[in-house]
């Protein structure tokens, strides 16, 4: 089996930065929030994932780090729309409902400032990402 997962929040500012901006204006989702699951970083911890795979019967487990740029939008407006639609920032924004809509202009202004500080090239706004490619064999 081979799968790819995100590494830590710190290794993936393209997802974590936007959430940090949104949390300056909105509360984090509560325990009963309708979230999208354990989150994109739930398998970032190599020792924990290795142990889970071993318990499931996998052997010859390898982790290979892959760092790569990711396009978050062709324009700042595209990037803001992307960040508020998916991922950790989008989840906080959706869960806040009318409170988020009331603060949308402030949030978008703050997010635009953060996004404008990122690298830009001919394709758009580029940010760093980091993943694990995890492989293992299950002899059974």
Locations of regions flagged by a protein language model:
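Hydrophobic alpha-helical core bundles mediating ligand binding, dimerization, or RNAP-core interactions
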Residues: 15-22, 49, 53, 79-83, ...
